[in-house]
């Protein structure tokens, strides 16, 4: 009888990536098949996020539901992973003794052994350590699920912003070697992936080892990824302004595979608040980056993160944030009311902004960015946009859907053979969360470039010793 696995995922794209790797890993080692129905599962895994307020209580509420399933089926294995697991550790079992496995973001690769241990003697397992690169070494080969894919290139963060738990729950920055990343992407491209999204908590801080022992830069990596045959679009998230160096901006100037859309969190437009947040950059420095980016790529659109109601934020501070929003003309944002995360320096600050004031500021900020986003969308009306067709539209099974370079969802009439390919679509209608259009050109009519293969890149950049022996070892 087929064994079933149910994974519930909360949080960022990194968590989504981790959950997909858990599923692949347990399929490869134990033959577990994913199910959307928790009641059918032999193993239940909760992949948690600790960014938002009351994250812990949300976890225990979900576990309370699963407890009822465990009472009906004592052999059911329940595991809790992700950032709340890393933060809370044994405390989870103190409140929910029926949980069998507690694992952190860096130990998910040990899940097969943890499950075997629980199956063997029913003893609970807790492993929230930080074994650095070992996680990536032990994950199964990637499996494509459509024309787009996420690829994790690094973990952790060294920035220690005062409001953020990531350095404490995912550890400090660890970069994957460039060869490992390129090999994974080449495998995905061979399975039909056309667009990759490079992931990291601070992705542009990537400093991975190259095949010759040197340390690569993020700009170097972007160019190598762009050279992989079949990869026509590259995205990355999430970036930090302090690591957004001029060599990355140059990649926007000369690498068309890098999309004209960037998510670059700023959090506030007030230098005083940025300093309290530990962001290590000013609003002016942020705007300087955007100015350089738009000089290199005039059509680039920018999204950002904002926290409103940070301890000490005055009306003047908020007005500076609104001015920054207008100056940069952000296309979209992820914006939140400040919520103190336990164990962070900001949790010890006096939360002196009234709750109603926080809500009002958030409403004003989101309304302004929604207006700017709609203005950007209206500019696209009547233009022809290149769309990567991802599948059937959520709005109608008779239509297809895909995304523009600037991350707009576009719905249009098409044929199933277009899925996984590019089409040019004339934009005919604009809606708050999507666009509509009609196909004017298929991929066969585009004459797309023939990409350079990884082998040719390596041959061109090959380094040899005095005997003519190359340093590269495939």
Curated annotation (Swiss-Prot):
One of its GO terms (biological process) is tRNA methylthiolation. Binds 2 [4Fe-4S] clusters. One cluster is coordinated with 3 cysteines and an exchangeable S-adenosyl-L-methionine. Its main location: cytoplasm. Residues 3-120 form the MTTase N-terminal domain. GO terms for cellular component: cytosol. It is found in: Cytoplasm. [4Fe-4S] cluster 2 binds at residues 157, 161, 164. Residues 378-441 form the TRAM domain. One of its GO terms (molecular function) is 4 iron, 4 sulfur cluster binding. It catalyses: N(6)-dimethylallyladenosine(37) in tRNA + (sulfur carrier)-SH + AH2 + 2 S-adenosyl-L-methionine = 2-methylsulfanyl-N(6)-dimethylallyladenosine(37) in tRNA + (sulfur carrier)-H + 5'-deoxyadenosine + L-methionine + A + S-adenosyl-L-homocysteine + 2 H(+); N(6)-dimethylallyladenosine(37) in tRNA + (sulfur carrier)-SH + AH2 + S-adenosyl-L-methionine = 2-thio-N(6)-dimethylallyladenosine(37) in tRNA + (sulfur carrier)-H + 5'-deoxyadenosine + L-methionine + A + H(+); 2-thio-N(6)-dimethylallyladenosine(37) in tRNA + S-adenosyl-L-methionine = 2-methylsulfanyl-N(6)-dimethylallyladenosine(37) in tRNA + S-adenosyl-L-homocysteine + H(+). Its cofactor is [4Fe-4S] cluster. Keywords: 4Fe-4S, Cytoplasm, Iron, Iron-sulfur, Metal-binding, S-adenosyl-L-methionine, Transferase, tRNA processing. Residues 143-375 form the Radical SAM core domain. Its EC number is 2.8.4.3. Monomer. Catalyzes the methylthiolation of N6-(dimethylallyl)adenosine (i(6)A), leading to the formation of 2-methylthio-N6-(dimethylallyl)adenosine (ms(2)i(6)A) at position 37 in tRNAs that read codons beginning with uridine. This is tRNA-2-methylthio-N(6)-dimethylallyladenosine synthase. The lineage of its organism: Bacteria, Pseudomonadati, Pseudomonadota, Gammaproteobacteria, Enterobacterales.
């Amino acid at each position: 009888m087929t064994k079933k696995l149910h994974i519930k995922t909360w949080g960022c794209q990194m968590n989504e990536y981790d959950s997909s790797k858990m599923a692949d890993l347990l399929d490869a080692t134990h033959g577990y098949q994913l199910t959307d129905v928790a009641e059918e599962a032999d193993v239940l895994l909760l992949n948690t996020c600790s960014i938002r307020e009351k994250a812990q209580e949300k976890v225990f509420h979900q576990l309370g539901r699963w407890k009822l399933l465990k009472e009906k089926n004592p052999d059911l294995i329940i595991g809790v992973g992700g950032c709340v697991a890393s933060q809370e550790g044994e405390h989870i079992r103190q409140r929910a003794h029926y949980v069998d496995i507690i694992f952190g973001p860096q130990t998910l690769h040990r899940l097969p052994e943890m499950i075997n241990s629980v199956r063997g003697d029913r003893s609970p397992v807790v492993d929230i350590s930080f074994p650095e690169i070992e996680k990536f070494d032990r994950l199964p080969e990637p499996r494509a699920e459509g024309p787009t894919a996420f690829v994790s290139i690094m973990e952790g963060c060294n920035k220690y912003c005062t409001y953020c738990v990531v350095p404490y729950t995912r550890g400090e920055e660890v970069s994957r070697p460039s060869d490992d990343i390129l090999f994974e992407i080449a495998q995905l491209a061979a399975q039909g992936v056309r667009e990759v999204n490079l992931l990291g908590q601070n992705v542009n801080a990537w400093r991975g080892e190259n095949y010759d022992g040197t340390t690569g830069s993020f700009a170097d990596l972007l160019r190598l990824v762009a050279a992989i045959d079949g990869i026509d679009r590259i995205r990355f998230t999430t970036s930090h302004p302090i690591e957004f160096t001029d060599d990355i901006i140059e990649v926007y100037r000369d690498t068309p595979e890098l999309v004209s859309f960037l998510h670059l969190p700023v959090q506030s437009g007030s230098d005083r608040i940025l300093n309290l947040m530990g962001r290590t950059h000013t609003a002016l420095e942020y705007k300087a980056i955007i100015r350089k980016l738009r000089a290199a790529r005039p059509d680039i659109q920018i999204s950002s993160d904002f926290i409103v109601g940070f301890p000490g934020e005055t009306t003047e501070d908020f007005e500076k944030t609104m001015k920054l929003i207008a100056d940069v003309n952000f296309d979209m944002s992820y914006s939140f009311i400040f919520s103190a995360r336990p164990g962070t320096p900001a949790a010890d600050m006096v939360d002196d902004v009234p709750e109603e004031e926080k809500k009002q500021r958030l409403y004003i900020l989101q309304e302004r960015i929604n207006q700017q986003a709609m203005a950007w969308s209206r500019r696209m009306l009547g233009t022809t946009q290149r769309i990567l067709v991802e599948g059937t539209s959520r709005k109608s099974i008779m239509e297809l859907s895909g995304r523009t370079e600037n991350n707009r969802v576009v719905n249009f009439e098409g044929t199933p053979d277009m899925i996984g390919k590019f089409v040019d679509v004339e934009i005919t209608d604009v809606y708050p969360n999507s666009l509509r259009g009609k196909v004017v050109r298929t991929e066969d009519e585009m004459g797309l470039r023939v990409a350079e293969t990884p082998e040719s890149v390596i041959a061109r950049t090959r380094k040899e010793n005095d005997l003519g022996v190359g340093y590269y070892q495939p």
